Regions:
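Mid-chain, structured segments of secreted extracytoplasmic proteins
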Residues: 2-41
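Extended, compositionally simple hydrophobic/Ser/Thr-rich segments
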Residues: 26, 33-36, 41-172
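Short, acidic/turn-prone active-site loops that include or flank metal/cofactor-
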Residues: 1-2, 166
């Protein structure tokens, strides 16, 4: 009850935002679970501590995921046209399902685990420490400029691979 009173739900630029006041300490609970239902979901911006799980599937045209937090984002049974992931935090982003186009960008420590997300076209860039695993059926544009590596499943006929860091790019 006390935790709920500290939470805020607001609408900003047609976006519903859920937050907890940083000045108030949330203590003495083992696990907090927040359930959200929505007719559409086009973006997830995760900047806190904890995990985001979508277990029962998500179908959307476009999905933007921004992860700057200390925790994981896990989406099972995703179906979308265009997926854009920006991982700049410590936690991992794990995706399963299908997408026409998947843009996966890692600048943080966490990994992007999208080996079970079949995408026709994949653009993957690793500029941090984290690794990217993806699955490309038609084309892949992969670039490594850091320590992290890019591993891709599938047999894409169109490949553009660029390595300027310590990391590797490899078909698995």
């Amino acid at each position: 009850k006390g935790v709920v009173a500290q939470g805020q739900v607001a609408v900003k630029d047609k976006t519903r935002c859920l937050s907890i006041d940083k000045s108030k300490k949330v203590r003495n609970f083992k696990k907090m679970k927040i359930t959200i239902t929505s007719p559409t979901l086009n973006g997830i911006s995760f900047k806190g501590v904890g995990d985001v799980h979508i277990e029962n599937g998500l179908t959307t045209d476009n999905l933007d995921i921004e992860s700057k937090g200390v925790g994981n984002v896990d989406i099972q049974s995703l179906t979308c046209q265009k997926l854009n992931v920006q991982s700049m935090g410590v936690g991992d982003v794990k995706l399963e399902g299908t997408a026409q186009i998947a843009a996966l960008h890692s600048k943080g420590v966490g990994n992007i685990e999208a080996g079970n997300l079949r995408a026709n076209a994949v653009e993957a860039s690793s500029q941090g420490v984290g690794d990217i695993t993806c699955n490309a059926t038609e084309s892949i544009d992969a670039s490594v400029r850091g320590v992290g590596s890019i591993k891709y499943k599938g047999s894409p006929t169109i490949k553009s691979l660029s390595k300027k860091g310590v990391g590797t790019i490899k078909n698995i």
